[in-house]
Each structure stands twice: as C-alpha cells, then as structure tokens.
Design a protein with these regions (language model features):
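Catalytic alpha/beta core domains of metabolic enzymes, predominantly
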Residues: 125-126, 139-244
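Glycine-rich phosphate-binding "P-loop"
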Residues: 135, 157, 267-268
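Active-site beta->alpha loop and helix N-cap motifs at the rims of alpha/beta catalytic domains
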Residues: 2-9, 13-141, 150
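Alpha-helical structural signal in soluble globular domains
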Residues: 59, 63-68, 92, 96, ...
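C-terminal alpha-helical cap/extension of soluble enzyme domains
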Residues: 6-14, 31, 35-37, 196-199, ...
C-alpha cells in the first residue's frame, strides 16, 4: 500500500508568541496542496514536535486533518523513545484522523536491531493505519540497517521507510531489500539519486518553500525522465545546502518568514538563524529564483 508517490512536505509548525499560529498553518497547508504535493507530514522533526505539549499536538492534528479535508493524506509523527508511549500516541493520532503515522526510531534509549523489530511490531500491531519507519541516526543514535528494514517491511501495516541516514549505499541496500514497501529519501539533496535506484519519492524540507518545484522534480523521476529530474536536483542542491547550514528547521523558518508565509519564531533550545548564514541563504534563494 503506497500512501503517496513523489513529494510529501515535512511541514513546519508556525508559532506565535502565545502558541501555534493556526492562521499561518492553514495558509501553509493550502499553499502546499495548491502546489501539488502528494502528502503532508506534520509533527515531525521540521515541525518541532519535540518542543510541543501533547495538547498542542492534538490540536495541530485536528486542525490539519480538517484543513486538508481529504485533499492529500496527512501523515502524523507519533514516535517516542519508549514503545509504550509510541503506541499510545499512534493510537491517539489515528483516532483523530491521521491517514498514516511517521514513527521515528527510539532515541536516547539506544536499542539493538532486534529491539527495533520488537518496537515497530508493537506499534504497527496496535493501530489500523499505515506506519512509516523514520530512520535519522544523526539525531537518534540508532540506525535501521537494511536487513532490519527487510524484517520490518514484513510486519502488517509497516508500508515504508523515510531513510535519512545520508548514505546512498545504505539506501540502495534498503531499496533492494524493501519488498513491496516504499523507500522515501529523507535528505533533499539525495532525492533524485535515490529515485534513480527505485525510491518512491521524498519527504522534503525544501518543499515548504518551493513545493511545486520539488513535486515536479519527483514526478519527472517517477516517469523515468531522469535527465530533467537530475537537472532540477542540481539546481536545487545549492539552496538545500543553505537550508541545512544550521539545524533544521532554523533556516527554513527564516526563509518562510522572508516570503511572508510564517513568523520566524522557534522554540528553545532552537534559536533564530545567524546573520552571517541568513545573508548567505538570501543569496542562494535569489540565485535559485533567477
């Protein structure tokens, strides 16, 4: 079962000084859908879920599901560093209308590969929604090895992996062992290389800013037009370097504020982008648009 093909946006959570900025969130959701993305991912890394209360998360899920109104799938981050909490959140967000769940590997608790299989088995068997495994070892300290995903892909409801290890060799092995499950790049700069090897698309940070471009690029790759897709990837890559010159989502929120799409407000310990790096990002955006 494929939840989407091509581009899903790892959506930011816009904040005001007093909480979640729902006016901006609604505009961002419409902006994404009107520019042809295949799905929305909320409460992920880019969405600053780690700094949000459970009540805020519940309200964001309810709002996003209603705002999307069935136009695209809404995929909700429901991971935790302990299995019991991840099961509870996955059930909760499923009951609120999530179309699928993005479940990051347990963080801080550095489990073994067999622990990963047990963890995802508990979660996937507790819900009736598709589950996407989220592998981002630079943040979690745990890496889902390709052979482990081969086992995970056989679990009922585990339908995909967001592979953000930044390693094309590992990604190629994961794709080879994934069976019927989808592999999505979690690294914007590796989208087209991954899709050339059989990945189904990307869960993208850059699409917050340029959703139509990323969507068009992934559609070209899906259609086998790799020359066009590669040309677009090479045009995008300098901008991607700027968008990750500081910890995500610091640069993307700066850029979205520059275009009037949301305020440049982050929650501690994240702080706003340095002037030196924001000046460089301004130039990269101008170059991309020229």
């Amino acid at each position: 079962m494929s939840i989407f093909k091509g581009c899903a946006t790892a959506l930011v959570t816009p904040f005001s000084d007093s909480g979640v900025d729902y006016d901006s969130l609604g505009r961002l959701i419409d902006f994404q859908i009107e520019n042809d993305v295949g799905a929305l991912v909320i409460l992920g890394t880019t969405g600053e879920a780690a700094t949000m209360s459970e009540d805020e998360k519940i309200d964001v899920v309810k709002f996003s599901v209603k705002a999307a109104d069935g136009r695209v799938p809404v995929i909700v981050g429901s991971g935790s560093n302990d299995t019991k909490s991840a099961v509870r959140l996955s059930r909760l967000f499923s009951s609120l209308g999530a179309d699928a769940l993005l479940v990051v590997t347990p963080f801080y608790n550095k489990c073994t590969q067999s622990g990963l299989v047990a963890h995802y088995s508990e979660i996937a068997n507790s819900v009736d929604k598709p589950v996407i495994v989220y592998n981002v070892p630079a943040r979690t300290g745990v890496n889902v090895l390709p052979e482990t995903f081969r086992k995970l892909a056989k679990i009922k409801n585990v339908v995909a992996i967001k592979e953000a290890a930044g390693d094309l060799s590992q990604m190629s092995d994961t794709i080879m062992l994934s069976g019927d499950a989808d592999v999505f790049s979690g690294d914007d700069n590796l989208t087209v290389p991954a899709m050339c090897m059989g990945a189904s698309g990307v869960i993208s940070v850059a699409a917050n800013l340029f959703p139509k471009f990323v969507s068009t690029m992934t559609k070209a790759a899906l259609l086998g037009n790799y020359d066009k897709a590669a040309t677009m990837q090479l045009k995008l890559n300098p901008l991607i370097h700027g968008l990750f010159s500081e910890v995500n989502p610091i640069p993307i929120k700066y850029a979205l504020n520059k275009f009037g799409l949301c305020k440049n407000i982050l929650r501690l310990p994240l702080t706003t982008m340095s002037k030196a790096n924001s000046d460089k990002l301004d130039v990269l955006i101008d170059d991309f648009l020229s």
